[in-house]
A protein has these predicted regions:
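Short active-site loop at a secondary-structure junction
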Residues: 16-20, 44-112, 165-179, 245-248, ...
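Short, surface-exposed beta-strand/loop micro-motifs that present aromatic residues
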Residues: 249, 323-326, 331-344
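Short, conserved catalytic-motif segment at the N-terminal edge
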Residues: 2-56, 76-77, 92-93, 218, ...
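Residue-level preference for non-acidic, small/hydrophobic
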Residues: 9, 23, 29, 61-64, ...
Length: 380
């Protein structure tokens, strides 16, 4: 199987513009464990290794969701309470205006976790005039992105896509990926605990789970570690420490990533292990939105802060692959568990606009692992 996994890694590294790639695959019982990397970690030519930390982008949403649910366990946050209960009044003013009706106070914490709020994505949605905010940021260079600026963009330049959804409905529930939801969840966390995100994630998750080489920008890892790999925009390096600190997304290593997902899946990340199952109680499928092609869409499903991905049977009729559960990020990174195969995997390529890469790599990894687990054919 290692040759097949190496082939997947080689293909990741060979993609246009990709300067390095990291890949890890591990069985649930750890009888099989494969970590590898290829390419240069930065423009000095430093080799990328499996131990090199890399930017995990929106995989961080798993960590944010875990912290929110830990606050729910302690009674500090309630999933079905309006999110405005936990943030300052100015943030909540007219944030969800649709057809002349302000539905901001109808949005619960659960809506934010499930991407069921209908709120516009402040980064990727296109305003009536001018470019998307993410494109403006990339052209302007490094700077802070405050919560007030995020709220102003959503309120003044964009409009909601649909009303907050009934998450108890029997039929289809509309969901649409929006980074705005998780910026608001970060605001809830920091307000409730009166502490910055880089300190919160350290005390709530990194220390209890011994994730020694994971940290949020503005913070430090628990243990001395290698310098992180560089983010790239094609063949050019992309350095934006202030912007990344504003986003709150983490740096981590492949080993820490798999350790975190194991803890999240088993419930060890929580005071009550049963809390983990809340993230996976209901799955709602994203639609396809041609106006924002870089956002996750069909056939991806979403729970509470967690993704489920599988390709339809008709897409791969002769070699279907089972679902994986976890998250991806826009920089071509992923962290997934496959319950059917009992397989954990993570990886990344650190390209600023490579969100589709994981969905091409995952089926290949699943097929390689499944073929490895199959018993040899009988000679009888």
């Amino acid at each position: 199987m290692t040759s097949r996994l190496q082939s997947v890694l080689d293909r990741l590294h060979d993609k246009k513009g990709v300067q390095h790639a990291v890949l890890a695959v591990e069985s649930g019982d750890r009888s099989f464990s494969w970590f590898a990397a290829d390419g240069k970690a930065d423009n000095t030519g430093r080799p990328m290794t499996p131990e090199t930390p890399y930017f995990i982008a929106s995989v961080t949403k798993l960590y944010i969701a875990a912290v929110v649910l830990r606050l729910v366990e302690r009674g500090l946050v309630h999933l079905d309470e309006p999110f405005v209960t936990y943030v300052s009044e100015g943030i909540a003013d007219r944030l969800h205006m649709l057809d002349g009706v302000d539905r901001t106070r109808d949005i619960t914490v659960r809506h934010l976790l499930a991407h069921a709020s209908g709120l516009a994505d402040y980064l990727e949605d296109k305003p009536k005039t001018g470019p998307r905010f993410i494109d403006r940021l990339l052209s302007e260079g490094d700077r802070d992105v405050t919560l007030n600026e995020v709220v102003d963009i959503v309120r003044d330049e964009l409009k909601p896509h649909f009303p907050p959804q009934d998450l108890d409905a029997d039929g289809r529930v509309r969901v649409r990926y929006s980074d705005t939801n998780f910026r608001l969840l970060l605001a809830i966390i920091e307000t409730v605990l009166d502490c910055s995100w880089n300190k919160v994630v350290r005390t709530e998750l990194l220390e209890p789970l011994d994730l020694l080489h994971t940290w949020a920008p503005g913070g430090q890892p628990l243990e001395a570690t290698h310098d992180p790999a560089t983010l790239w925009a094609g063949a050019e390096t992309f350095s934006a420490p202030r912007m990344l600190e504003s986003f709150g997304d983490l740096f981590s290593t492949a080993a820490d990533q798999l350790a975190f997902l194991r803890a999240l899946w088993s419930g060890a990340a929580f005071n009550n292990p049963a809390t983990a199952k809340h993230m996976r109680e209901r799955w709602n499928t994203f639609g396809f939105d041609p106006t924002s092609p870089r956002l996750p869409g069909w056939p991806i499903e979403y729970g509470l802060g967690i993704m489920r991905f599988s390709l339809p049977r008709w897409y791969m009729p002769f070699s279907p692959v089972p679902p994986v559960i976890g998250h991806t990020g826009s920089t071509g990174c992923w962290l997934y568990y496959c319950p059917e195969l009992d397989m954990y995997t993570c990886g990344g390529v650190d390209q600023v606009a490579a969100g589709a890469i994981p969905f091409r790599a995952i089926p290949k990894l699943l097929r390689a692992f499944r073929n490895h687990k199959r018993p040899p054919p009988s000679n009888s």
